[in-house]
């Protein structure tokens, strides 16, 4: 049986660093991230939709705006995390080094299930563009 999929695109601006990166990405820096948020369902609603796009906007895009937009995202094991948090409450952490791959993973494995728990959809894949030339994806494997 197939699945229906819809994609909502959303852009935020935030900073990060890749702890122990071998070149300049080890430094604090920022991106204009573009997220491609793919939601899936085996069934359509009574109007023939996976879900109204406004629901994705109200839940997932709002979460991104509230939690990551104009914030500094660091790995919770990064020595800079606790030091920067003392200076600025806009520093947030995730349980992995905040590469594009891991940010996508965090959304699919942690945020999506929390936000969509009562809905008949799954956040099945996130593609994250760091630049117009570089992107990374994470998807639920079937």
Where are these regions (language model features)?
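Charge-rich, low-complexity N-terminal segments
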Residues: 1-142
């Amino acid at each position: 049986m197939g699945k229906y999929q819809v994609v909502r695109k959303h852009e935020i601006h935030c900073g990060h660093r890749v702890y122990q990166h071998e070149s300049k990405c080890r430094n604090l820096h920022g991106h204009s991230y573009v997220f491609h948020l793919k939601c899936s369902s085996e069934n359509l609603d009574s109007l023939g939709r996976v879900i109204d796009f406004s629901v994705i906007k109200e839940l997932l895009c709002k979460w991104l705006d509230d939690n990551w937009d104009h914030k500094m995202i660091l790995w919770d094991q990064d020595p800079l995390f606790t030091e920067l948090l003392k200076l600025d409450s806009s520093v947030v952490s995730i349980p992995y080094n905040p590469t594009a791959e891991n940010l996508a993973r965090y959304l699919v494995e942690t945020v999506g299930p929390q936000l969509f728990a009562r809905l008949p959809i799954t956040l099945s894949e996130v593609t994250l563009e760091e630049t117009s030339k570089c992107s990374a994806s994470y998807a639920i494997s079937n």
